[in-house]
Amino acid sequence: MKRRVGGLETEYGLVCVRADGSRALEPEAAARELFRPVVAMGRSSNVFLRNAARLYLDVGSHPEYATAECDDWWELVAQDRAGDRMFAELAAEATERLAADGQDARIHLLKNNVDSAGNAFGSHENYLVDRRGEFTRLPRYLLPFLVTRQIVTGAGGVVRPAPADGAPEQEAGPAQFVFSRRSDHMWEAVSSATTRTRPIINTRDEPHGDPTRFRRLHVIVGDSTMSEVSTHLRFATTDLVLRAIESGRALPELALHDDIAAIRAVARDLTGTTAIPTADGGTTTAIEVQQRWLDHVTEFADESEQDVLETWQRGIDAVRTGDRSWAATHLDWAIKERLFHQVAERRGVDLGDPAIERLDLAYHDIDPTQSVFAALQRRGLAPQVLDEQRIERARTTAPTTTRAHLRGQVVTAAQEHGVDHVVDWTTLRLTRPGAMPVQVLDPFATELPAVDALLEEIRASAAGAPESPPPFA
């Protein structure tokens, strides 16, 4: 599939604390306060926005944002950043309301994957694949790539080995920097579950499109990344690997003996050279898997994707050579590795110190006034590829080259004219009696007569009515 639609779902960590750092509100209460404007706008904590994205409160009081369908990976990054901005404003407004009510409380939203209590949050990637392809063949080739790509696209973090049974906490092993903390929360290679037995690839068959033509590949192993370069690489490299697999040509035989053991071993080896047992009885390394896939997909990349290959290679080389000079200002794991070691050395503490844990959380805070990552961007120590105008435009404008364009048109028109409506990924409908739903099962559709008729119906039904003000966005 040369042209592919994809999307990103991000679960945010939510905490509400007093000025002294103690908990001010339980997550459920904080979530209710956070979503108050959302519920006021859509009478629900689950809404689709003018940019065709979905903003909602997931199970467990996790705020979540799902981008609209994108067929350009930089547009996906812009749409993802737009979600960060919207949630950051919701958090700031909620904090202001709490202060006006006399409460010492600040709501923080964290774009990370593990909190201080060990709770895990997801960053789920979605890729459109052809139903006629051999979906059961995908994991065999895709899993080694997904297990090892953390050496380039991981968010980085610190783990401390648990003490032996019955041993005191102080006897736990030394804290260690890893490519990805998410790796410790994967329990299966392939499964239809998403939480209790969290897999690398989720196989639940929900295509959000014509089920006779399409299937949705749901990858839930990824880290939530603050760096635009890291986020872009996650999608652009995976897309290239999928194209190679779909081509039907000979592929690198890199199947691993135990994907879950391998993903944990790769996370802890910052040299990328730990021997990983393969299914055929041999061994490989994370660097070898990534390099072989990069070399293999080169022929599938067009001229506009040469920068993806170059950036991918620079990421691999940063691990292979140990020279982090480029990676430490572009890739999340390397930015954090340098930052954490600098702070630990300056304070005379090890990586297991609570100050480093607080620094990790602050790095992933999406509030630009609180975020360590945003501070690094302002100092030129972290990448800022997309200009502000593009991110701001993505807050209210859906991608124009996918089905999202149609959904965005309907939501925008309905909100502007005060017309009640219900939409989801495939269906658009007004909520008046007798209204017929319009289905858009082709994710690539940007024009549809039935949608044009629905837009005319919205305008006609609102004739003479005052326009509604724009909702939060």
Curated annotation (Swiss-Prot):
Keyword Disulfide bond: no
A GO term, aspect molecular function: ligase activity, forming carbon-nitrogen bonds
Pathways per UniProt: Protein degradation; proteasomal Pup-dependent pathway; Protein modification; protein pupylation
Known EC number: 6.3.1.19
Keywords for this protein: ATP-binding, Ligase, Magnesium, Metal-binding, Nucleotide-binding, Ubl conjugation pathway
Superkingdom per UniProt: Bacteria
Catalysed reactions listed for this entry: ATP + [prokaryotic ubiquitin-like protein]-L-glutamate + [protein]-L-lysine = ADP + phosphate + N(6)-([prokaryotic ubiquitin-like protein]-gamma-L-glutamyl)-[protein]-L-lysine
A biological process term (GO) from this entry: proteasomal protein catabolic process
Positions of Mg(2+) binding: 9, 56, 64
Primary enzyme class: ligase
UniProt key word Acyltransferase: no
Catalytic site: 58
Listed InterPro entries: Pup_ligase (IPR022279), Pup_ligase/deamidase (IPR004347)
Residues that, per the record, bind ATP: 54, 67, 425
Family statement drawn from the similarity comment of this UniProt entry: Belongs to the Pup ligase/Pup deamidase family. Pup-conjugating enzyme subfamily.
Record HAMAP family: Pup_ligase
Other facts: The reaction mechanism probably proceeds via the activation of Pup by phosphorylation of its C-terminal glutamate, which is then subject to nucleophilic attack by the substrate lysine, resulting in an isopeptide bond and the release of phosphate as a good leaving group.
Function: Catalyzes the covalent attachment of the prokaryotic ubiquitin-like protein modifier Pup to the proteasomal substrate proteins, thereby targeting them for proteasomal degradation. This tagging system is termed pupylation. The ligation reaction involves the side-chain carboxylate of the C-terminal glutamate of Pup and the side-chain amino group of a substrate lysine.
Protein name: Pup--protein ligase
Highest classification ranks of the organism: Bacteria, Bacillati, Actinomycetota, Actinomycetes, Micrococcales
